Every structure is written in C-alpha cells, then in structure tokens.
Amino acid sequence: MEEDKQYKVLLIGDSDVGKTSIVKRFSDDTFDEDLLCTIGVEFKMKEVKVDGKKVDLCIWDTAGQEKFRALISSYYRGAHGIILTYDVTKRESFDNLNYWLNEVENFANRSNLVKLLVGNKIDKENREVTREEGAEFAKKKAMLFIECSAKSKIGIQQAFEELAQKIIEIPQNTSSSQPKQRNTGSVKVEDEPDHNQGVCSC
C-alpha cells in the first residue's frame, strides 16, 4: 500500500489579513473574531483527499509583523506550497504582495514551488481590491488565485484542495514520503529554528 505523503505549506502576507483565521477554519472549522496576532510560527496538520488519495498538509502560519519578518525567512526552506494572503478590504495588503513574493524568491529553495494567491474577507462590504485585480496579479505572477472568507467558510476548503492538487501533480513531490509529525505546535522566533527537530520537518 502506498504511504501517505506530507507536504509543507506556508501562509504569508501582511499582519491582520486573516492567515490564522484561514488556517483555523480549514483545520478546525472554527472562527474567532478576536484572534491575537501570531507570534513567530504556528503549524497545523490537516488531511485532504485529492483524486481519492490522502494528502497530509503541514500548514505553517507565519507572523506578518515587520519586526518578525527577518526571523521568519528561514521557515521558507522546504516548503512545497505558498499561500500568499491579502485582505480585500485593505489596499495596502494588496500593494505589499510584491514584497512577499521577493521573500519567496530569496528564501524558498524549491524551483517547482506552488503559489496560491488568496484574497480574504470577501464577506465584508468595504472592499478596496476587486476580484479582477487579484486575478490579474496572480496571472502575471503565474499563481493560482481564489477569494475566500474565513468567517463564512467560502472558498477555504477549495483553496487548500486546489493547492494540494497542484503540489502532487509535480513528480518530484511524490517520489518520496515525509515522516508524519504531531498535529499542532508553535516555534518561538527568538530562537534560530532547529531543522533537526521533529516539527513538521518536510
């Protein structure tokens, strides 16, 4: 029987765009209006089915605050997928997307990295970024694109399933399996990450 595969997915983007809410909605089907900002990196394990196959995603939720950005850079290594997130009600978070893509270019170490652009908070009425703008940006950068709402659940499951589908379509990603890790955890940014530890080490 073929072993299940585990793939590392990193959520990046400005602070307060809803990265943690997206992860919690996907992994636990919960939503909290009063979530605190992520300090450092937190991760969750979640299984999805793609074409009848079980795919284990190790989802890393990163801090978006500027003071943590340099410390987070090392966590790009080994990622199979990137979810670049912005808030459709905050133009600045969309304008900063190129900064985050530069971070990916500088620190990610896979040439076949799958990138998904996600516009979050479409449940709100005060939209500042149109769907067309998001789709056009993603097209120019060769990214997948979806809009979603962690609050109303719209697009959340689809986003991760589409990303997982693209990841496993890459032959190099399915040639060997990664050891399964525990289901949740966090990493302090004060410390240099130890990549020999059993923390979702895909």
From Swiss-Prot:
PROSITE patterns xref list: RAB
Bias (Polar residues): 171-186
Gene3D superfamilies documented for this protein: P-loop containing nucleotide triphosphate hydrolases (3.40.50.300)
Sites of S-geranylgeranyl cysteine lipidation: C200, C202
Residue ranges the record marks as coiled coil: none
Record's protein name: Ras-related protein Rab-18
Function: The small GTPases Rab are key regulators of intracellular membrane trafficking, from the formation of transport vesicles to their fusion with membranes. Rabs cycle between an inactive GDP-bound form and an active GTP-bound form that is able to recruit to membranes different sets of downstream effectors directly responsible for vesicle formation, movement, tethering and fusion. Plays a role in apical endocytosis/recycling. May be implicated in transport between the plasma membrane and early endosomes.
Species of provenance: Dictyostelium discoideum (Social amoeba)
